[in-house]
Amino acid sequence: SLVASEFVTKIDELINFFKGTFYGYQYNDDFGFEYKVEDALKDVEKFGFLNIQGTELKATPLGRRVSELYLDPSAAFDLIQGLKKLTSDFEDIVLLHLISSNAEMYPWTNIQKKDYEWLEETTEELVDKIVTKAPKEWDYEYVEFLKKTKTAVLVRDWIMELNEDYLLENYNVPPGELRNKISTAEWLLYGASELCVLLGEMEKISGINKLKFRIKNGIKEELIPLVKLRGIGRVRARKLFNAGIKNVLGLRNVSTEKIAGLIGSEKVAQSIKKQVGHKRMTEADFENF
């Protein structure tokens, strides 16, 4: 971020900056201090975020965007590598596993003894689909991989509209931790969408943004048209959908009283009718809405 903002433009300026930090105060006398800074620069250059010409430092367009997104360079690089492997018609769980495996999602969801069997079965089902490397069960990274997989399944069940009580009982994840994971997943998907622009992966952006909206609201894809309206969350949307009111067309063509009866609020029902208009719609009208 120092280079991206042009606060420093040379290697010696960067080293002097770090010498003035608490880390520098502690380790400035360490023989390898400057080498550590230079090694970190080489890593960021390898990631494609930085150009080093002699002693001059300049962030690449991709590096500047990573800095603007407040992503850790290593985590951003891992995300980019996964996005490049992602197919345009990706399954939800594949992208969820990618972001759940990212270092920015740490700490991952803890696993209990009862989780191992179903997580191993889930891993077998996913191993040929996911874009992240799956370790062997005897590798030291295996338990961490299972934690990442559990995190991905947790978020998937959230967008499948399973409630917080179910997630607490089955995954031992309290509401506060769940909200933290949801928030981080949203942020990573926003970052993924923005990075796709610079990577030229435009065909993946729509699917990423749709999944981000679903995570924010905890809904299946079929509820998106309803939840886009003010005053309709996932509970009200599901009640409307189950009653056969599935979109703006359906809302326009039923009475305010029926909507109020379903969602339990006359005031919100009136607001919804104002948003969609009172005129009855045909299928052709709906397509042009």
Locations of the language-model features?
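C-terminal helical accessory/scaffold domains
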Residues: 38-40, 46-228
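Active-site-proximal structural scaffolding
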Residues: 7, 30-37, 43, 59, ...
